[in-house]
Amino acid sequence: MSVWGKVLGASAGFALGGPLGALVGAAAGHYIAKFRANALSSEGSDNASFAGENSQEARQVVFATALVVLSAKLAKADGVVSREEVVKFKTIFNIPKSEISSVGAIFDKAKETADGFEPYAEQVAQLFQSTPAVLENLVGALFEIAKSDGWVHEAELRYLRNVSRIFGLDSGTFARISSQYAPEDGEPDPHSVLGVSSDTPDQQLKARYRELVVQHHPDKLIANGMPPEFVQKANEKLALINSSYDKICAQRNIK
């Protein structure tokens, strides 16, 4: 079963708590915000709670659910939900036809207003606080939704910046993400992609590159809770990191 078939939780034996669980329950016509003893989150938290042996799968369900909700909130941020944004959402996230209606119910419920996205962002931020690369990929996916109608509107950019802040990503990381997904003049600047400057010493450049490759390797992201359905996007991001490093090395004649 794809991760999209698990977002409602009950059929897979999951119990999704907190704001995400409440919204999913409302969309499904019932609430499934129950808690289990072996929680992924800290005791007393409102985050999603699953059996310990399902921790990786549980994180994947939370990731996918949060992405549906935050994408819907983003689509409404500029005041209008365009057809391009809805189509782009279905395309980027490879939602099977059999799951479109159930995922669509959550999307529709979440887009009723652009207000109130913070609790959902806070819930997923707490769960993935030790794996910021997963959160970075989530923000990147939101950027793709934002630019699906040709450009990123100012209201959408504010929304993305606020989500990134709640995720605990600093301004430098947000600038690096935005340079990858919303370049002003075509190709992303390789220095911006790596988060370095033109005068960064070669050894620091190499260290930074290696750090990013480790953080954003698809296998590691999946192990940390990114659903396998997103591996193509992860591969594209890793390829961009590699090509950016190669371009800088060519400019500097680094062998």
Language model segments and positions:
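Small-residue-enriched hydrophobic alpha-helices in membranes
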Residues: M1-K76, V80-K255
